[in-house]
């Protein structure tokens, strides 16, 4: 992958590491990387503000370790992106794209079991439609096996057609 600006759009904190953590480790040396999270990842589990703060602090600590800019949290309700107007989600993503001007976006696979993953994919693809001059040249999906492997009735299984060799970073990714 050529040097450029990468935007990772993930539904929840930790999706970016599970889905493309090794790729982040490899590409951060020669690329600018920004990450946005659509939700806090805890509110649907009946967790309280302490759990949310703990998860956010762990996320920020990881980003300091990775030496990439702090992520942006959009704070939509967890596991409820299907109840949020799609246009509202799209406009937040479009604003980030217009400010950051990424060349490449990594996001969820379209047929994940998790509704937030599917809606994130849909919003990213809609935000990148070619109606205006847009910076995004490539949209790549990542897999989160716990979500894609259980999506039996949501269409095709994840079938990657783009690979990043992360063999030099595999042990570090596992330890993230």
Question: Positions of the model-derived regions?
Answer:
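Metal-dependent de-N-acetylase/amidase catalytic core
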Residues: 1-9, 26-29, 47-53, 61-65, ...
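Short glycine-rich catalytic loops that host catalytic nucleophiles or stabilize transition states
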Residues: 37-38, 73-77
């Amino acid at each position: 992958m050529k040097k450029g600006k990468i935007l990772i759009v993930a539904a929840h904190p930790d999706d970016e590491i599970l889905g493309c953590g090794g790729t982040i480790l490899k590409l951060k040396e020669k690329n600018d990387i920004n990450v946005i999270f659509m939700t806090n990842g805890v509110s649907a589990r009946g967790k309280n503000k302490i759990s949310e703060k703990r998860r956010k602090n762990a996320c920020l600590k990881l980003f300091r370790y990775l030496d990439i800019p702090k992520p942006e949290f959009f704070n939509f309700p967890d596991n409820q992106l299907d109840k949020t107007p799609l246009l509202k989600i799209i406009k937040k993503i479009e604003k980030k794209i217009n400010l950051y001007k990424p060349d490449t976006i990594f996001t969820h696979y379209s047929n994940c079991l998790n509704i937030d993953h599917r809606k994130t994919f849909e919003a990213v693809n809609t935000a990148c439609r070619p109606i205006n001059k847009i910076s995004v040249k490539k949209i790549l999906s990542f897999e989160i096996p716990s979500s894609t492997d259980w999506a039996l009735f949501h269409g095709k299984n994840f079938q990657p057609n783009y690979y990043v060799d992360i063999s030099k970073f595999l042990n570090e990714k596992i330890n993230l």
